[in-house]
Amino acid sequence: YWPEYSCNGKEDTKVSDLLCHRAAMFGFKEGIPLGSFQDWNKFIQQLQLQTPYRKPGISQGYHALTFGWLVGELIRRVDGRSVGQYFKEEIAEPLNIDFHIGLDEIDLIRCADMLMIERDSMQLPGQFLRYVPSFLLPQRLKNFKTALLSGDFLEAFQEREEEDANYVNSLDWRKAEIPSANGHGTAKSLARLYGILSNGCARDEISIMSEASLQYAITPHSSGPDSVLFGAPIKFGLGYELAQGISTVGNISPTLNNKMFGHAG
């Protein structure tokens, strides 16, 4: 699908690796490209030439920002349309879902501003674990320490230097198509979308996908530990985050199967 991506150690990357956060491309090694967020090709060119952080397919690391460009470019290569255009024409408009990947001028006035946390106020949890010998830690905390020392979190959630933390309120950001970070919509529209997916994947004779495709997509394809999210045993299907099993009475009752899917963020 994407011949230019097949270089510099990424030659054996599978589509499933991109969809379940195992492509080892969770950050921009040279920093997030400067200039307009609407310049899709600038971000794609940097990613397709980059070497992965480690061998693709071996470990899980949440692709917080890069996921949207990587999977979005696959969609563009296969279909010819951008991910925002595809979503609008194939899903949002036919099913009356007020959700957008890249806002049109007419919708800007409806958009609420966001108040972002300054990076200096974001203290990484568990810094003290750096100084605790690993053999003294239970496995979950060992995974946490390994992820903390790797620095993967800072790579995946990096920001452009000297950028105002409230850049997400800029016209450039709102008009850009950044599928992993700047979808704009209403709570009702998200409820409608997931209501359709959880009830046969179709409404008014319009189908988003087959039920078989959805069941395949929400089958666990990766389950951590996640090197970006501090070693957490997060499960991913193909594009969806999957819920963990739940216990009704603390840890003493049997674990129940939890079929929720979507994203916790």
Residue ranges of each PLM-predicted region?
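Generic structural signal for alpha-helix termini and adjacent loop/cap motifs
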Residues: 21-22, 50, 196-200, 220
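Glycine-rich, aromatic-lined ligand/substrate-binding cores of catalytic
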Residues: 186-189, 195
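Short acidic alpha-helical/loop segments enriched in Asp/Glu that coordinate divalent cations
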Residues: 202-215, 229-231
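Catalytic-site signature segments of enzymes, centered on catalytic residues
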Residues: 3, 10-13, 20-112, 167, ...
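Active-site Gly/Thr loop motif
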Residues: 118-187, 216-265
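Non-catalytic, well-ordered alpha-helical segments in soluble enzyme domains
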Residues: 76, 194-205
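A generic structural signal for nonpolar/aromatic side chains embedded in well-ordered alpha-helices
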Residues: 18, 46-47, 217, 240
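Acidic pyrophosphate-coordinating catalytic loop
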Residues: 5-10, 229-231
